[in-house]
Amino acid sequence: MNWMPALSLALLWTAWLVCGSEKTGRLAERGSHGVRKVPQSHRAPSSLLRRSGASLKNLSPSPQHPVTKRDSSVPPKAPANLLKEESRSQPRSVGTRTRRLQRLTAAAKYSKSEMIKDEGISTASQSRAVRFPSGSSSPNVLASFAGKNRVWVISAPHASEGYYRLMMSLLKNDVYCELAERHIQQIVLFHEEGEEGGKVRRITNEGKILEQPLDPALIPKLMSFLKLEKGKFGMVLLKKTLQVEERYPYPVRLEAMYEVIDQNPIRKIEKMRQKGFIQTCKAAGVEGQVVEDDNNGGSTQSIPGGGHVQVSAGGRKEEPRRSSNQPTRTKTVRKPMTTTVATPLPTVRTTTLPTTTTATRATTRTVTTASRPTTTTTPLPTTQRTWTTKSHTTTEYHRLPASPEVTTPRVMASEDFYSPVWKANRRDRQRGHPEKHLAATRKPSKGGRYESFTEVPTAPSVHYTKASMSRFKDNRTDRKDYNHRDLNVTPGQHKPTKTKPPKKKTQEKILSNEYEDKYDPSKPASPHLEEEIAVGSIPPKKGKESKKHERMDKPEKKKKKDRPDKLHKSEKQSKKDKAEKKSKQDKDRSKKNKKGSRTENEDFPKPNKKPFLQPPRKSVANLLDYFEGKRRLILITTPKADNTMYVQQRDEYLESFCKMATRKISVITIFGTMNNSSMKIDHFQLDNEKPMKVIEDEDLVDQQLISELRKEYGMTYNDFFMVLTDTDMKVKQYYEVPIAMKSVFDLIDTFQSRIKDMERQKKEGIVCKEDKKQSLESFLSRFRWRRRLVVISAPSDEDWAYSQQLAALSGQACNFGLRHITILKLLGVGEDIGGVLELYPINGSATVDREDIPANLVKDIRNYFQISPEYFSMLLVGKDGNVKSWYPSPMWSMAIVYDLIDSMQLRRQEMTIQQSLGMQCPEDEYGGYGYHSYHQGYQEGYQDDYRHHGSYHHGYPY
């Protein structure tokens, strides 16, 4: 029985082992998604783990950090199946533990190799992008659009071609969000010899246009690839697969192009995926803005403030002063060791320069102390610091002049004063200098960037070198002091600087005496300070200035005491010289000796006249120089665009487009009051003349330019006023009320310059006749914002639908006139085509003026509106030139057309004016369906017909 206790102990030990193994298995299963623990007895020694290079703590995933980033310092996670096997297995010996650690190490290496492989793939794709560029100057410019965008190619001989100008006039600023929603990009080609060129117009998701120049060598290749005909206008619409979807030999309305694109099945998916795209695009507020883009993907847009805006390829505009997401840059800071002795309170002044992300250029800055202490400057080796910043700052370096002694040079950096880095360094600097009134001598160290900054009391004097001034000459308004704490600045520091370069030493003394006479030398803003600013802007005088600094900074007090006496003597001497020169000039004036006066004018210019009075006169002079000898001007002022007198005058000259063009008239219209105005310039030109662009768009709202132009011609009234000038820009006639253009033309024909033009135009055969071949653009411009067009097309005048439509139009002259409707009839097929234009008076009278339309114009109109000549069709064109509704079958009653017109916003304003004037048609003529109210019988009788034709109203808002 002695074996019983031993048996019981063995059973207990076995049960303990079994329970322990089950508990370990449950913990392993429970921790499959959490932290996996290994019993302490089965863990490898820490030294072995360190030697193997894989720690269980690092390999086990953490709940707070389940995913390891690529650039993280933590090793990547091992595969889940390996860890699961390790948690379930029970190691029984050291060999088992060693094998487990080897497997974990292999798993870590496996993940690391996957990570390296993934990075290699991205590097390969980047290298592919470098080897196969897709810029506008590369041969595969079309390949950059493949699979992503539709391409709309416009080809024209040159930019002044009539069809091209008409097509570009249809591309208003509010259409680019529609184009971006359909993934349309534009390529413009000019293929005439000598004017070959082009541009790629990339439309961003915000409706902005990034224009990239196209290599002229690619023009013939693209023309042959797209099968475009040379010497003619043509357009091609390409699918996303770069296959030709549609060809257009004439300009077409954008709705016709949208209709072709929207028929593709992929458009349904695009619409579902891009819900609200157009609203978001228009809300960005940059639709239609054109930005010139270079081929590297970046773009630069000039702004009126003088700086530059950097725009990325995605269309994002960065701020002019700060740019985000800047790469790591290496900047070199020169740290001079400065020894300064001074007692007044310090003043800190910083100048922030405009941001440019292309390059960092150096500018020279010298800060001069008011008390002129003795300074010893020792330049140390340059130290390179590398850091990454979110707000871009332009560092200013100070290059030491070539002189043995300099007055307190400093290396300062323009920083972002709102960044936490600057605040922290500012606090460190203040803690490092508790006693600012004592002299501080500091040795620059490599560890701290700001330790070399010696705070000394200064009356700041900043003068730039020629290089820096040429770069920032237009950016004076951008150099603002955002941290202005200089409380002791006297008014003398804000005086305008002199720009005259002194020629001789005696003249330099005279300049100094003038400043000494104006300002008190005992004040911090010393006369020497102003003298330094005046001379410091001229690079050849830097040596003399440094010598002057050297002479002024010597510690001998004797010279400082003697200086006022010398200044008084030189001042008296200068006055004597002036008096002698003046008397000598008066004596020699009768002998016509202008040498002395010219020398004096060179020595003593009037610096205040040029910078303030010259630019406005020069701007107006430049504006008028464009027209002088070439064009005649009609200048009109009006308080607002919808002024009644202005609208009447505008309609007058728009009706006489050809006569205005033959007389070379340009119209400058100024809207608004004397203090707040905008300007518009219209040039009336013949088809063979190149389009003119006199000034940029920002100059059209230049208040100073408009004010000077008003004063130049005496147009200082806020009411309607009109001025007529000849080619010499001299006023010929004033008009205070609208005038018929026939009387204006009769007056112009009496000008001597016009008589010569008439003789020359008669020899060249340039005349304006009603049957003269006119372009589609000039024809449509007659009706834009003045008349609504009802275009009726039929294969012949015997067509049944055409005759039915004519029956419905009979007796509607009054309704057509009050609604400003003009009927345009296009008849015929093939070569036997023609047309008739019927004009109805706007006062509602029954008289009708008819004009014949030539065959070439009928063909152009049908091509423009995409009208088939083989079938009957009728369409309504609004005053804005857009098609409002299509009618493929005759309308038995014009009530439906009147209903659509009367719902337009512009028509409602017309109705209000006509009702106030009592203008209406008799009830018996229009049968009760005028613009006042519908007769109940017509309302019920044509309700079904309206529903039938409702599908042809394409949902236009007006």
Curated annotation (Swiss-Prot):
Return the protein name. Coiled-coil domain-containing protein 80
Record-stated family: Belongs to the CCDC80 family.
* Source taxon at top rank: Eukaryota
Give the residue ranges for region: Disordered. Answer: 30-99, 290-335, 358-396, 424-452, 467-617
InterPro entries listed in its UniProt record: DUF4174 (IPR025232)
- Output compositional bias ranges, type Low complexity: 358-389
Q: Which residue positions does the secretion signal occupy?
A: 1-21
Q: Give Gene Ontology CC terms.
A: basement membrane; extracellular region
Q: What subcellular locations does the record give?
A: Secreted, Extracellular space, Extracellular matrix
